[in-house]
């Protein structure tokens, strides 16, 4: 039995083919249009929590999709480590199966990305992942190549013993990156995440849940020079522009850490109303060692997260009203180590002399949005949304005191209209228009150390702060055409074209454009 379940899930996720069929959320013989699939995904409240055991309460119908996407971004309105030009091609497949004794969902994504005119980062696959201790170069424009693999699945039981459900979510990521200009970098990031959980039905309308969160991650960064005749400078970052300047081949850096956390959920539902709340907390400890042969502990981060999510849906025959909110507070201590080399024959290596907290990083993220959906059969006729995403950064280097602060909000208004082009082949044209406005409320970078001449202080950090404190406005337009590939089947093919631009009037920046083309099928 287990073998058959795994085989069917594998087929669904990797090949995008749904082995079993469901009619409850489909127009008979028409499958899912693009709008219908969006509507299905938009109603999965438990899916957006850390608890896979709640899958049964989402009542998601079976579906599968397979799509290919090409995405291109260009323009100088971006954060300091982001490349000015990015080209990305990816293949993505996703499937949901209700097999009676088990509910299963999975996704797989492979992404190949080329970057041009990327500056400073000379160490990490993703310099924005929350790790402040890494290496940068002198800011010369460079090319990067990325290959990313992402696999995630959820498996859960239906209700057992009249009240209980059990589930687990697992995620595996492998990200490979290579910098194409001296000093060159080969960076490899791996992450495994496990999230077991359970739910308990208190009454016919109330459900509580609890889940655990464990993450093991590792990144290896290996610098090298192809032109040994030219010795280039590099900078080992220790927070807010504070850096140690080096010259030559660079260094090998080993990052490894674990995250532990837990989450609690509560749901109340009736025929016309459903609200789900989640409270979560976790802690990450990640070590930074230099060299693989004779490791020297250089730094460590201790990160704590505390947050909540609330999803509220009100249903009627014609409309769905949704109000969603989230909040996350992240506090990170940056710890540096002082070590001494021990060259004795018995214990060659490094001796730790002292370590202390030298920098702190605090991030506050909050979101609030409202979505109104006008229903039409198993899809929607139109959908409107408004929302705001807020982020506050408060970073401090303790001695000598330096700081970097900013408060930003992105406001948006979204409208989608699902036009019926034809009925025999389920032809649909989905129009999606979004207006965006970025507002910076405050921000400042103030370095008070002794090395004002370093490029990390003169240019790198001020450029990043300039982006964070710059206002902008923009728009996004996308068109998705979908139809049945053959009559009397439920296989819909679709093509999506999307364009967006974010424009700033600041002297330092101009704009950022994004063009995307997607081809896919769903069942």
Predicted regions and their residues:
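Outer-membrane beta-barrel "beta-signal"
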Residues: 29-31, 204, 511-523
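Transmembrane beta-strands of outer-membrane beta-barrel pores
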Residues: 68-74, 110-114, 159, 172-176, ...
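Outer-membrane beta-barrel translocator domains and adjoining extracellular loop/strand segments
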Residues: 76-82, 117-123, 177-185, 221-227, ...
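Residues that define the transmembrane beta-barrel architecture of outer-membrane proteins
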Residues: 85-91, 145-151, 186-192, 256-262, ...
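Short, flexible helix-coil linker/hinge segments at the edges of structured domains or between repeats
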Residues: 120-136, 180, 214-256, 285-300, ...
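Long, internal scaffold/assembly segments composed of regular secondary structure
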Residues: 242-386
């Amino acid at each position: 039995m287990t073998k058959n379940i795994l085989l069917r899930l594998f087929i669904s996720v990797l090949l995008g083919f749904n082995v079993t069929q469901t009619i409850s959320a489909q127009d008979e013989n028409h499958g899912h249009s693009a709008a219908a699939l969006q509507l299905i995904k938009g109603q999965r409240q438990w899916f957006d929590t850390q608890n896979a055991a709640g899958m049964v309460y989402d009542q998601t119908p079976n579906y599968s999709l397979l799509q290919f996407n090409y995405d291109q971004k260009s323009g100088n309105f971006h954060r300091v480590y982001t490349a000015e030009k990015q080209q990305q091609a990816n293949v993505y497949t996703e499937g949901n199966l209700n097999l009676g004794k088990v509910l299963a969902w999975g996704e797989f994504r492979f992404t190949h990305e080329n970057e041009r005119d990327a500056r400073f980062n000379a160490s990490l696959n993703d310099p924005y992942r929350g790790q402040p201790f890494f290496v940068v170069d002198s800011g010369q424009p460079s090319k990067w190549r990325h290959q990313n693999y992402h696999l995630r699945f959820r498996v859960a039981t239906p209700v057992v013993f009249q009240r209980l459900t059990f589930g687990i979510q697992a995620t595996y990521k492998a990200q490979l990156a290579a910098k194409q200009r001296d000093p060159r970098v080969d960076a490899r990031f791996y992450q495994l995440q496990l999230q077991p959980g359970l739910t308990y039905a208190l009454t016919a309308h109330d459900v509580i849940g609890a889940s655990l969160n464990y993450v093991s991650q590792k990144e290896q960064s290996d610098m090298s020079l192809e032109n040994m005749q030219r010795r280039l400078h590099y900078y080992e970052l220790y927070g807010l522009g504070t850096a140690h300047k080096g010259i030559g081949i660079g260094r090998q850096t080993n990052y490894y850490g674990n995250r532990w956390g837990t989450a609690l959920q509560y749901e109340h539902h009736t025929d016309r109303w459903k609200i789900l709340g989640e409270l979560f907390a976790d802690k990450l400890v990640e070590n930074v060692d230099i060299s693989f042969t004779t490791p020297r502990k250089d730094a460590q981060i201790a990160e704590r997260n505390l947050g909540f999510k609330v999803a509220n849906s009100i249903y009627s025959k014609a409309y769905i009203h949704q109000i969603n909110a989230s909040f996350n507070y992240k506090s990170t201590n940056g710890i540096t180590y002082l070590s001494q080399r021990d060259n004795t024959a018995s214990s060659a290596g490094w001796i730790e002399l002292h370590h202390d907290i030298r920098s702190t990083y605090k991030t506050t993220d909050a979101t609030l949005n409202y979505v109104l959906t006008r229903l039409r059969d198993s899809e929607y006729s139109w959908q409107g949304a408004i929302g705001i995403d807020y982020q506050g950064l408060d970073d401090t280097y303790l001695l000598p005191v330096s700081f970097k602060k900013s408060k930003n909000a992105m406001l948006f208004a979204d409208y989608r209209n699902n036009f019926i082009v034809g009925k025999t082949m389920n032809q649909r044209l989905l129009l999606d228009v979004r207006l965006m406005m970025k507002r910076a409320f405050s921000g400042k970078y103030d370095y008070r150390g002794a090395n004002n001449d370093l490029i990390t202080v003169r240019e790198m950090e001020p450029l990043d702060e300039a982006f964070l404190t710059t206002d902008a406005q923009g728009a996004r337009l996308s068109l998705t055409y979908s139809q049945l590939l053959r009559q009397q089947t439920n296989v819909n093919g679709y093509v999506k074209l999307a364009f967006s631009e974010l424009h700033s009037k600041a002297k330092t920046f101009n704009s950022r454009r994004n063009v995307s083309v997607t081809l896919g099928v769903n069942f």
